Amino acid sequence: MGFLVNPFRFTAPPPFGIAGLKLWLDADDSSTITKDGSNLVSQWNDKSDQGNNVAQTTGTEQPLWVDGVQNGKPIIRFDGVDNSLFRAAYTGGTITQPNTWFVVLKMPTSYFDYAISSQNTARQLLASGNSTAITFDMYAGTELETTDIDTSNILLYTLVFNGASSSARRSESAYLSGNAGTNGMAGVILGMRFSAGTGHGNPDIAEILIYDVALSTTDRDTIEDYLTAKWGL
């Protein structure tokens, strides 16, 4: 969809113009994805101006680019066995709180399986559950979770990590709030826990945007509306 401000001028769609963008991964932008003839992804480039690309050099651990999955658009699929994409550190260092994530994905289907995590033990993460049950779990030192989790559909989630005032929205509606802890985010891992070989999840990931601020309601709604329309959610 285009964002029209007058009949003769188009502006770039969100998230351009909203300050604080540190990571933007878009599965619908083929120019940002390096894949082989079997559609195995070795690198997914960041569309922000930060250069926070994620990669996987081991061929057997590369996720799969799959076309036409959501609203006719491709996604990146992780197998829940050994797939991951990662970056050891963000340009500019650890992202501290408050920070805001917009993620369009299908959550992993097994408990203690990770969708997005950080590279260190003092980390932020999004996972399907704790060590004993399937839950929607956002964590930055303290579990903030709910058993109301959808592992069947690609949905939009908006996460604000802000200590005791952390929150999550699902499909543009309030979903979860409370204390998620105060950890920052050092680097990023998709499809795996922070330590190698553990917590592999099987998310389908369509798009991720991470900001190093708590966005205003207006900016949050602008990005949510953009992603909802783009991905047919």
Give the label of every model feature segment.
Residues 2-53, 104, 207, 215, ...:
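GGW-centered surface loops in extracellular recognition modules
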Residues 7-8, 13, 24, 28-30, ...:
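Beta-strand repeat scaffolds of extracellular/surface proteins
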Residues 12-17, 65-68, 91-95:
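A general structural signal for short secondary-structure junctions and capping/turn motifs
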Residues 17, 95-96, 181, 186, ...:
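Extracytoplasmic/secreted proteins and extracellular or luminal domains
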Residues 47-82, 92, 101-112, 117-183, ...:
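Extracellular glycan-interaction surfaces
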Residues 186-197:
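Predominantly extracellular/luminal carbohydrate-interaction, adhesion, and secreted-enzyme modules
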